[in-house]
Amino acid sequence: MYDVTEWKHVFKLDPNKEISDEQLEAICESGTDAILIGGSDNVTEDNVLQLMSKVRRFLVPCVLEISTHEMIVPGFDLYFIPTVLNSSHPDWIVGLHKDAMKEFGDLMSMEEIVPEGYVILNEECKAAKLTEANTALDIDDVRAYARVAEHLMKLPIFYLEYSGTLGDIELVKETKAVLSDTVLFYGGGIENAKQAEDFAQHADVVVVGNVIYDNFKEALKTVSAVKKSS
C-alpha cells in the first residue's frame, strides 16, 4: 500500500484537458511521487477511464480525487475523497460521501480510500463556487480547520487549495506548524520551479497542475525543485 507521508511532489491531471502521449510519459517518469486525476469541470467516467488507462502503463501511483460519484471507476491505486471543511453546504462535507458509499461501498476496498480535509481559499475558482466555500478566512481560521482535520476528524491529509492562484506562503507555514501527523498538501498557482521550491519548504506535498498545460517544460522542473527543497 502506498504511504502518502513519504510523498513530496504530485502532478494533478485534468481529464477534461488535452495532453499528448509524449507529455504524459514525461510526467509519469519525471520522478513525481504520484499522479492525481481530478477536476471540477466536465469530468466524466469516460474521460477519467481513458486518462487512467494511459497512466497505468507506468509505475507511478495513480490516484483518483473524487468530486462526483459518477466519475468513480475501478483500477486506481488510491481514491482521495475530499471533505470541504469550509463549505457552507453539508453535501460537500458528508452528504455526497454518504451517497458514494451507499452506491459503491460494497465494491470498494476501504484500504484504497484516503479522506482529505479540504480548505478552498480562492473565491474565484470553480471549486469554491461549486462547493459554496467560505473563503474569507484568516490564518487563525485555517489553523483551526487544520486542528479539526487532525485531532477531531483524524484525517490523514489536510489540503490547502488555492486552485489557479498562488497562495499565501505565510499561511501555509503557520498551518504546517499546528500539524503533527496529518500530511499538509498545498495546491494552487505553481508556475515555476522556484515557487514549487518555496512552498515545499513548508508544505509536506506540493501539487502541480495547471502549469502542465501552460508551460510543460517548467512543470517538469518542479519535481527536482521540490525534492531538493524537502
UniProtKB/Swiss-Prot annotation:
Binding site for Mg(2+): D14, S40
Alphabetized UniProt keyword annotations: Lipid biosynthesis, Lipid metabolism, Magnesium, Metal-binding, Phospholipid biosynthesis, Phospholipid metabolism, Transferase
Cofactor: Mg(2+)
EC numbers on record: 2.5.1.n9
One GO MF term: heptaprenylglyceryl phosphate synthase activity
Reaction(s) catalysed (UniProt annotation): sn-glycerol 1-phosphate + all-trans-heptaprenyl diphosphate = 3-heptaprenyl-sn-glycero-1-phosphate + diphosphate
Binding site for sn-glycerol 1-phosphate: K12, Y159, L160, E161, Y162, S163, G164, G189, G209, N210
PANTHER family in the record: HEPTAPRENYLGLYCERYL PHOSPHATE SYNTHASE, PTHR40029
Function: Prenyltransferase that catalyzes in vivo the transfer of the heptaprenyl moiety of heptaprenyl pyrophosphate (HepPP; 35 carbon atoms) to the C3 hydroxyl of sn-glycerol-1-phosphate (G1P), producing heptaprenylglyceryl phosphate (HepGP). This reaction is an ether-bond-formation step in the biosynthesis of archaea-type G1P-based membrane lipids found in Bacillales.
Protein name: Heptaprenylglyceryl phosphate synthase
